[in-house]
């Protein structure tokens, strides 16, 4: 309807079941976030696209690199000024070394179920297509997720928060695994299918396997001068940190610690919270629980204290999930 704000979401969870890289809680994260979007923020179920790699998923909706990028492109194409776009990702992250030069610099990427990496450059190009006046909020509970929108302004990172971020003594009764795939593991996995020697850069493997569907980072792309935009990244950790995937005694309670912190913060504060508050309160909760990862916020100055997902009022009632 003309004049009515659209609320659109794409939610992705990759557990990589049956592989050496299997995680436990990524699909649970997605299901919990879907319920929260509907109950708290008023998203219509039909406007939420869910891509997971469990047995219930048809090939057409598996979270491959191409399918994720297609879903995000379709969401942005539907958007108009004033709309609220949301992307949630739970799964492995990795760091990709530059192909030439730049010393030891590495860039951030997420790892879809087919290992067709989606990089910070892809997310930058996506955000650049968001209509002016719309917002694109991204929550990524993956390792090295800080900086996943290339050139987005740092607002809350470790050096900008004055708090006692010392390691907390103590243990948890639940097993935690990092949502991180080393670069060598990514190349090793791809080389078996690409036919390219494992000594080559990951770009050679991805271009051989996926062609035009490979990340723009590995093809020619322009690097525009950054300017304020509607991109908002809430990362599960800093770019040099890992994000924890926690296996609970009850399998239904498996999940990512960063996602769990966001859910807990939202549940404890039904009234609108700013992007800054969601990240800061999530950091404090993880610190209290003894997890050494630091969620971060990247966005324009105007969006730091804007309401998370543009929530304007407290929901009348949040049904039990």
Residue ranges and their predicted role:
Residues 16, 27-28, 108-157, 194-220, ...:
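Catalytic cores of nucleophile-dependent amide-cleaving enzymes
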Residues 255-267:
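Short, small-residue alpha-helix embedded
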Residues 1-105, 230-231, 247-256, 299-321:
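Boundary/activation segment at the start of structured domains
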Residues 9, 188-242, 247-251, 265-321:
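Caspase-like cysteine protease fold
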Residues 6, 61-90, 94-157, 167-174, ...:
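Caspase-like (clan CD) cysteine peptidase catalytic core
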Residues 28, 257, 273, 277:
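Conserved active-site and cofactor/substrate-binding residues in soluble primary-metabolism enzymes
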Residues 18, 40-44, 55-58, 75-79, ...:
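Generic recognition of well-structured, leucine-rich alpha-helical segments
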